[in-house]
């Protein structure tokens, strides 16, 4: 009797769960905005006719990615950037890369010197050296060719993980303007700029250099030079100071360095918006964990990220878009003492259990945009407001062993303003220049 009762309870529970899933899928089928394809050069026609009000009224758009090495994420983000340029007046493109990338890229996309086959060498992040991203830079260049300078697209880096060459900018400015500065301070700037971060061990050398860099900044601030180059060199010094501070924290108790990096990215975005954007609008290209409006990693972590700072400061003027996927091919970095470390391509053939993707694979659209504000207001069986699993794929790519380490809990309505779901993903095109 007890066995029959347990079977009955299990069947009833299964019936209820299936009913809830059917209700959720029906709501998503009826309310999600279809994205026609992942072609970055085609128009977002359906989205344009159904643009969520919060999206239309926003000024700063954070577009994430569930991994740093997925063709569809890159192409769809490029597609949305072009849409925002054409329809909402966005001209500022900010990337999860270093400040040093700006000069070469901006010269090329504004019609100046450069080579399409080498333009991506300006990036510090290996992941951006793909045909998909170079094609986007080419589109920016073509767009800018017949535009006055004040209406051209400009590229900016917000990250602080590299100090290389910043010292050269500082020395050039000081020599050109004949500013009297202690040579020892300039040598400190040289050392900090040229020294790479060793993430494996603590080095207190970095923290002793910070007050010296601040002193150098004060000496430049006290000069009588206040032109455009002055503003640029102060910005360079701020990046170098931030890099040095970050380097001093990499072996601190978690999550100090993680939060510091995102705080500095927020400060850099804020500076760019306030000083370089004529209409206060900007597009941010980064990982989901940086641009989401709540926190890093699992729900409840309280690790404050870039997107949380942006949402707290800009309120509804900041719009966060996350990405998720179901199946497909993706790269992962393998540490192998025998064969040597290498990248491996994995084929995810079905969505994982207890994930948002498991349910989203049942909808009638291959790619869609979900307005999460609408999901909150109109139901969807509260699917997006319930905690569910999500695959976290960071800089090391897909690492399925052990799987539980990359399965994190999220509540999507708390995490993003909008969600883009892609049923099947593939690898971007690396080594394209050959």
Task: Go through each PLM region and give its residues.
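Structured catalytic-domain cores with a bias toward divalent-metal coordination
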Residues: 20-434
């Amino acid at each position: 009797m007890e066995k029959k009762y347990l079977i009955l309870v299990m069947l009833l529970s299964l019936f209820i769960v299936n009913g809830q899933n059917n209700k959720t899928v029906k709501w998503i089928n009826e309310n999600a905005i279809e994205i026609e394809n992942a072609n970055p050069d085609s128009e977002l026609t359906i989205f344009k006719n159904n643009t969520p009000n919060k999206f239309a009224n926003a000024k700063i758009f954070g577009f994430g990615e569930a991994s740093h090495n997925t063709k569809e994420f890159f192409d769809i983000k490029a597609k949305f950037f072009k849409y925002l340029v054409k329809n909402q007046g966005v001209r500022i493109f900010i990337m999860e890369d270093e400040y040093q990338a700006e000069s070469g890229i901006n010269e090329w996309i504004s019609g100046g010197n450069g080579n399409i086959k080498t333009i991506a060498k300006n990036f510090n992040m290996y992941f951006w050296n793909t045909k998909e991203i170079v094609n986007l830079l080419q589109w920016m260049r073509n767009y800018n060719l017949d535009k006055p300078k004040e209406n051209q697209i400009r590229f900016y880096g917000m990250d602080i993980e590299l100090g290389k060459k910043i010292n050269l900018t500082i020395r050039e400015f000081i020599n050109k303007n004949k500013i009297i500065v202690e040579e020892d301070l300039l040598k400190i700037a040289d050392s900090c700029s040229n020294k790479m971060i060793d993430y494996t061990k603590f080095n207190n050398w970095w923290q002793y250099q910070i007050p010296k860099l601040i002193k150098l900044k004060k000496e430049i601030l006290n000069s009588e030079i206040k032109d455009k180059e002055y503003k640029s060199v102060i910005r360079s010094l701020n990046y170098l100071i931030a890099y040095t501070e970050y380097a001093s924290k990499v072996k601190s108790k978690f999550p100090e360095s993680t939060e510091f990096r995102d705080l500095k990215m927020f400060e850099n975005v804020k500076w760019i918006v306030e000083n370089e954007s004529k209409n206060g609008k900007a597009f941010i290209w980064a990982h989901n964990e940086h641009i989401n409006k709540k926190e890093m990693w699992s729900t409840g972590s309280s690790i404050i990220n870039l997107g949380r700072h942006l949402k707290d400061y800009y309120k509804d003027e900041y719009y966060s878009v996350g990405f998720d996927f179901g199946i497909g091919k993706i790269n992962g970095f393998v540490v192998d003492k025998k064969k040597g470390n290498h990248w491996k391509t994995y084929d995810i053939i079905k969505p994982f259990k207890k994930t948002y993707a498991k349910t989203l694979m049942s909808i009638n659209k291959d790619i869609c945009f979900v307005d999460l504000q609408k999901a909150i207001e109109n139901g969807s069986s509260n699917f997006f407001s319930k905690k569910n699993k999500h695959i976290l794929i960071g800089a090391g790519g897909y690492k399925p062993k052990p799987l539980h380490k990359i399965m994190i809990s999220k509540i999507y309505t708390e995490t993003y303003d909008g969600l883009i779901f892609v049923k099947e993903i593939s690898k971007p095109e690396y080594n394209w220049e050959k």
